[in-house]
Design a protein with these regions (language model features):
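NAD(P)-dependent short-chain dehydrogenase/reductase
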Residues: 17-65, 72
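C-terminal amphipathic/interface module of NAD(P)-dependent oxidoreductases
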Residues: 126-167
C-alpha cells in the first residue's frame, strides 16, 4: 500500500488490512484472471493484443476455477482467512505466447521488450509485480484446482473470439 504501487495494489492491500481483524471473513485472492472468453479483462486477450509483451513469471487464476473454489470453500465451511485462489504452478509470458501460437495460430510474431529497463522507461506507469502465490492453504482446505498449464491449454482450445467491432 506504499508507493510506488498501482492504485489497484494499494487499494487491495488497504482493504485486506481493514478486514484483517474482523475474524469471520474470507479474502479470496485472484491473480491475473483468464478463461476462454475473449475480452478486455482477460489475460489471454491482453497478451494477444499487446504490440510488445513483457516477459515475467506469475500465478494465474482461471475465472471458472476461481468461482468454483470460492464456493467450495464456503460450502465446506473452511476456516476464515485469506486464500490464494490461483491455479497451482506458474507460467512465464513466453510459455503463454508459445501456447497461443501453437493453438490459435495468430499469424503475427510476438515481440518481447528487450529488458526491464526498456519496458519501464517506455510502457509501464507503475512497477509490475511478478508473483507466484502459495496455494498450500487452499489445498489443505480440500480445494484442488487443475494446474495452470492445463487451464490455459483448455481455455485456448475452447477460445471464443470477440466479434469484430463494426466500422
Amino acid at each position: 500500500r506504499h508507493p510506488p504501487c498501482s492504485f489497484y495494489s494499494g487499494s487491495k492491500a488497504l482493504g485486506e488490512e481493514a478486514i484483517q481483524g474482523l475474524g469471520r471473513s474470507y479474502v479470496w485472492r485472484l491473480r491475473i484472471p483468464f478463461d476462454q472468453h475473449d475480452g478486455p479483462r482477460n489475460y489471454l486477450s491482453k497478451i494477444q493484443r499487446y504490440s510488445k509483451v513483457y516477459q515475467n513469471a506469475n500465478s494465474l487464476s482461471h475465472r471458472g476455477d476461481f468461482v468454483r473454489a470460492c464456493l467450495d470453500l464456503w460450502a465446506s465451511r473452511a476456516p476464515f482467512g485469506t486464500y490464494n485462489v490461483t491455479n497451482p504452478g506458474f507460467v512465464t509470458t513466453g510459455q503463454v505466447v508459445e501456447r497461443i501460437e501453437a493453438i490459435l495460430k495468430p499469424g503475427r510474431p510476438f515481440v518481447f521488450w528487450a529488458n526491464d529497463e526498456e519496458f519501464y522507461r517506455t510502457a509501464a506507469k507503475t512497477p509490475r509485480s511478478n508473483c507466484v502465490l502459495d496455494t498450500r492453504k487452499l489445498r489443505e482446505a480440500g480445494v484442488v484446482l487443475r494446474p495452470v498449464e492445463e487451464a490455459i491449454e483448455e481455455s485456448l482450445k475452447q477460445w471464443q473470439a470477440e466479434p469484430p467491432k463494426p466500422s
